[in-house]
């Protein structure tokens, strides 16, 4: 998989 999940904190 080439998923990018970015969660700004």
UniProtKB/Swiss-Prot annotation:
It comes from the Eukaryota. Belongs to the germin family. Probable receptor for the plant growth-promoting hormone auxin. This is Probable auxin-binding protein. It comes from Populus euphratica (Euphrates poplar).
């Amino acid at each position: 998989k080439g998923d990018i999940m970015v969660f700004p904190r």
